[in-house]
Amino acid sequence: MGAAGNTGSSGDSRELMSAADVGRTVSRIAHQIIEKTALDGPDGPRVVLLGIPTRGVTLADRLARNIGEYSGVEVGHGALDITLYRDDLMQKPPRPLEATSIPAGGIDDALVILVDDVLYSGRSVRSALDALRDVGRPRVVQLAVLVDRGHRELPLRAEYVGKNVPTSRSESVHVLLAEHDGADGVVISR
């Protein structure tokens, strides 16, 4: 996604996170979600993780597996396609629609955690909030990201952040995940 950077890398680049770092970070975010939501408590909320395609869906799947392993609570997870809700639809090359998949219980009255790989301007998150409105009415919506690179254009913040990485606007942050790229890692490039 261009400047947000979640596909490939080019030019001068340097590693920000190794595969081991990515694994530890996803594990830490899973623990934070369990702790902050009291998910494993007697009155824990129904939590649904919805990944923003493409890499956010993979991260949501990994988080759900980790949360289940650490807490013993199975968390519903799926994908939320934001393509038709983007405000830059006519400015970027066309991209294929992704499937939106919502867990069987739906999202009404659930604590929904949107999951994305990189938080940059906040426009993808705004698009996800618009898409979410057409799917149901969650009780609470939170955001989890692997990397927050700053430069917000909208008043949004993530509750769960793997790594804060100050960047310039001329740099791109690329999250690599084994399921898509053959290996895990995060690189920054100019």
Swiss-Prot record:
CDD domains: PRTases_typeI. GO terms for biological process: regulation of DNA-templated transcription. InterPro entries: PRibTrfase_dom (IPR000836), PRTase-like (IPR029057), PyrR (IPR023050), PyrR_bifunctional (IPR050137). One of its GO terms (molecular function) is uracil phosphoribosyltransferase activity. Keywords: Glycosyltransferase, Transcription, Transcription regulation, Transferase. A motif (PRPP-binding) lies at residues 112-124. The keyword Zinc-finger does not apply. It comes from the Bacteria. The keyword Transcription applies. Its EC number is 2.4.2.9. Disulfide bonds: none annotated. It catalyses: UMP + diphosphate = 5-phospho-alpha-D-ribose 1-diphosphate + uracil. Regulates the transcription of the pyrimidine nucleotide (pyr) operon in response to exogenous pyrimidines. Also displays a weak uracil phosphoribosyltransferase activity which is not physiologically significant. Belongs to the purine/pyrimidine phosphoribosyltransferase family. PyrR subfamily. This is Bifunctional protein PyrR.
